[in-house]
Amino acid sequence: MKSLLSNLKISVPDKIFLKDPESSDLGKRIIKHSILLIDDIGFDSFTFKKLGLLISSNESSIYRYFESKHKLLLYLTSWYWAWIEYQLVFETFNMPDTEKQLSKTIEIVTRSIKEDFSFSHINEVKLNQIIINEYSKSYLTKEVDSENKEGYFVIYKRLISRIRDMILKINPNYKYASSLASTIVEGALHQHFLKDHFKSITDCNEDLTPTDFFKDLVFNAIKS
């Protein structure tokens, strides 16, 4: 799987960027160091000026790739969900058992992230922390409906649709497949956040993981 993934290009909706950052060394440095900087200081404090100083490049050169830091965040979140989707597809492709396929999918979507060295300019562990802490800022905006129409969230929605379809294969009569699928994806981020910051209001910890919780939740729901 790793060798196969290394030959694949993660595709992000092209309306999100002005110039594909994967097309140049500068673009890849923008992505690499934006992840490190946002993880370090948070998205609210992040600016293109600070990023430019970090990569020794003019602020204006960053604007050639992204028109705003919001678009950069959309790029990073889209890349992340596409990366998760690739793992889901390749790790479940040869699984004829639908329950095992869904169980593996829940594991992929909810597990703690390890760095994937197939993409040398992207630290997936730090990117995962950005998704946990900052993802909601990519869509909790006044422009969410227009951006949705432009296809900015197509990868995220496609991932949830894949999970929904797996749920329906197991129980075609389950009425809440889309709601459950989106709860797995969003809820996993929330449980990881609670595990790190509000330990008293989650049962998830080092021994009982979000993966354990969501497997229990999902299979009890669809088999009841």
For the regions a protein language model found, what residue spans apply to each?
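Intrinsic, short, N-terminal disordered tails of RNA polymerase sigma-factor systems
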Residues: 1-11, 124-129, 134-140
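Amphipathic alpha-helical packing segments from all-alpha helical-bundle domains
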Residues: 100, 130-169
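C-terminal peripheral helix-coil segments that are non-catalytic and often amphipathic
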Residues: 1-11, 157, 161-169, 182-224
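Hydrophobic alpha-helical connector segments
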Residues: 91-125
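Helix-turn-helix
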Residues: 44-71
